[in-house]
Structures are given as structure tokens and as C-alpha cells.
Amino acid sequence: MAQNKLHVKKGDMVVVISGKDKGKKGRVLQAFPKEGKVIVEGVNVVTKHRKATRPQKPGGIIHQEAPIHSSKVMLYCENCGRGVRYGIKILENGEKVRYCKRCNETL
């Protein structure tokens, strides 16, 4: 059975490394560990045609982000200015933090 764990979390700044949105940066809005997918702000925007369900809720054309596979995104380091690999280290107080493998800054 596959492990249901992602390398990015909700709120992380990521960069897309492949596909039609390659190079775009955005925050992770939602993560789906069981599917291995994430929704990134401003990435993989699709057009939905919604039908009016009630008079209070009008229909129309709506643009929204669709999930992309988590393997297509990489954690973004503000210090390096690019997508980076990360490591995990334990601080003196016992707290686990992720750090950039390139510049050793805490992410």
C-alpha cells in the first residue's frame, strides 16, 4: 500500500517544475494526501460553466484552480529564489523544522 504523505503542506510557497504552468509560484491552498495532489493558487486554472440553481445563486462562467500532482511542485526558498530540496532538523528545544538544503535557511 502506498504511503499517504506529501512533501508540501497547506500554506507552503511552491514552484511548479513541469507542465503547462512550469515556473509559476503560488501558495498551496489545499492538499489531498490520499490522491497525492495539491491545489496551488493561480496554477492549473480551469473554466467551469455553472448553471443557476436558485434565483439567489446565479450561474455563469467561473475560473477556479484544479488539483495538480504533488510531484510537479517543489518547495520554494525565498532566500535562494528558486525551488529547492529540503531536509528536516531538530532544534535544541525539540522542535522539528524544514530547512533548505542549498542555503541552510529555515523554510
UniProtKB/Swiss-Prot annotation:
Keywords: Ribonucleoprotein, Ribosomal protein, RNA-binding, rRNA-binding. GO terms for biological process: translation. It comes from the Bacteria. One of its GO terms (cellular component) is ribonucleoprotein complex. One of its GO terms (molecular function) is rRNA binding. Disulfide bonds: none annotated. Signal peptide: none annotated. The keyword DNA-binding does not apply. SUPFAM superfamilies: Translation proteins SH3-like domain. Belongs to the universal ribosomal protein uL24 family. One of two assembly initiator proteins, it binds directly to the 5'-end of the 23S rRNA, where it nucleates assembly of the 50S subunit. One of the proteins that surrounds the polypeptide exit tunnel on the outside of the subunit. Part of the 50S ribosomal subunit. This is Large ribosomal subunit protein uL24.
